[in-house]
Amino acid sequence: MEISWGRALWRNFLGQSPDWYKLALIIFLILNPLIFIISPFVAGWLLVAEFIFTLAMALKCYPLLPGGLLAIEAVFIGMTSAEHVREEVAANLEVLLLLMFMVAGIYFMKQLLLFIFTRLLLSIRSKMLLSLSFCMAAAFLSAFLDALTVVAVVISVAVGFYGIYHRVASSRTEDTDLQDDSHIDKHYKVVLEQFRGFLRSLMMHAGVGTALGGVMTMVGEPQNLIIAKAAGWHFGDFFLRMSPVTVPVLICGLLTCLLVEKLRCFGYGETLPEKVREVLQQFDDQSRQQRTRQDKIRLIVQAIIGVWLVTALALHLAEVGLIGLSVIILATSLTGVTDEHAIGKAFTESLPFTALLTVFFSVVAVIIDQQLFSPIIHFVLQASEHAQLSLFYIFNGLLSSISDNVFVGTIYINEAKAAMESGAITLKQYELLAVAINTGTNLPSVATPNGQAAFLFLLTSALAPLIRLSYGRMVWMALPYTLVLTVVGLLCVEFTLAPVTEWFMQMGWIATL
């Protein structure tokens, strides 16, 4: 019997999302106009809370859909205007270009990145050194590339290796269902469970590595570019400005990596089983023998393009997004990718998030029009200049750990810039606040997958169920890093940021605009 029209409409609305989630969104959409009539300020804060809720529930439904509905309604009822949304999007065009072109550009360098991580995995036998290498490699790559892409590459390596051993363990060469363990005997299951633990720890080290490296440069995370643009910094300026906080945090983060592996705590310490290593090594040897000159040329070309990418970013030869576009053109031209559909695949990872970011800017427009953050900013600015840095860091950290850090970073840097332009703070203080906002947005956000897009990408990937990586387990494994990165970052903002920045100015390395 066919379902009713109403039931069909209900099922289509937000698709497979739970009924309670659909009902919650409908209630939000009904309440917002009613509350806006009574108190625009309260309605504005309610919208922000609802939007954060959609980000926190990203596993139930991609936030673009519910967040987009809320944003459309906000414009429709007058909380902001379509013109203001356009202005916010135009002001952040560089970030949108970064997401569209840089992420797509790195897609065409995946073979090189896969090669690097595969060599690391099979060449280093010490688990402590391997974990450190993965963390450092992810940090270095994320300083120049998009963190999502770096994590995507590591996921590809892990899924590939898991599939190789799973086929051997199940004695089925055509094993397509990697979640089906029914054909694996008891002995192999023990080894497989150990292998899962090994992959879980490597993925978490790599994920945290992207946060450690991503905070250091203006292209490491999308919000970094927003903050750099607001402060008028180029690549070198941004790196030096952040270094009083980010360099000590990087060192402590890498020491944490070694410590958790040494103590075998928080789910770390599992080694690669020897039987698995033998299977993977055999497969890698076969792959290398089958690699043609054409394949080798592709790797060499991608490495040269990587050098171009780093050089162009460091010398600020063009806007970041345009450098990404040059990577697409060079990589496709020189590696033989000429089909439109093959090129189109490169954009599938970045465009949904680009659309979501545009919705962020709609909510930012509401925040500005309704002056939602004015009381908070007023409270912070009442404190001494020294205390302002820590307060901005803490407020950013709290919100970033449960919400998307692009959203949070954009809000706070806009408010700080408005305070500077109104004369409430000096330009020098504003530049220090920009560092506190950037580090506060990036570092504590490793606490949950909601804050770090790379973590959320890992949690929703095909790999997560294979290696038994749940939301709770990810939060638990991230806990030592969360504590170390947050506390060390706060101490650096409190004690080293101002004096080291002053010393940099005296040396002539940086200058106030």
UniProtKB/Swiss-Prot annotation:
It is a multi-pass membrane protein. InterPro entries: Na+/H+_antiporter_NhaB. One of its GO terms (molecular function) is sodium:proton antiporter activity. It catalyses: 2 Na(+)(in) + 3 H(+)(out) = 2 Na(+)(out) + 3 H(+)(in). One of its GO terms (cellular component) is plasma membrane. It is found in: Cell inner membrane. Keywords: Antiport, Cell inner membrane, Cell membrane, Ion transport, Membrane, Sodium, Sodium transport, Transmembrane, Transmembrane helix, Transport. Pfam families: NhaB (PF06450). Na(+)/H(+) antiporter that extrudes sodium in exchange for external protons. NCBIfam families: NhaB, PRK09547.1. This is Na(+)/H(+) antiporter NhaB.
